[in-house]
């Protein structure tokens, strides 16, 4: 009887350990790609030093992600090595015109989890206006990637910010597109 009880307990512990989910904190990354010119050429960037808060419930991915929050400081946008002018245009012209001096807030409200894929309803708040952006996610080789598209025209200063960016960035050819691809990436903790 004792062996059966130990075997059952071991199986339960192993099963719960296998389904426990969390992210490696040093792997978390929020990226974006905006588009410019009449040919819709992409320009990629990321946000550094994002503040994250995840659920302490790690029994499964949906529980871990539901209610997760991120606070993004627009001044921490980084457009890549050697792209100081682009980074400056984004942090000193575009985001101040879009947001003033407020942060971007993200909350994962709902999560539908399938087998290594799913959908997250992300509530994104900028300058006191919120919109829900569906993010589709996949997990492959212990890497999590969620992607969606944000329409900047949703926000009251979206058109103004896009025009300000087009005016200061000659490489835009007078066009900054309102659609921005957004992504959240992380490595799963072992």
State what each model feature region is:
Residues 8-16:
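Bacterial N-terminal signal peptides
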Residues 20-190:
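Low-complexity, acidic/polar, glycine-enriched regions of mature
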Residues 1-4:
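Positively charged n-region of N-terminal signal peptides that target proteins for export
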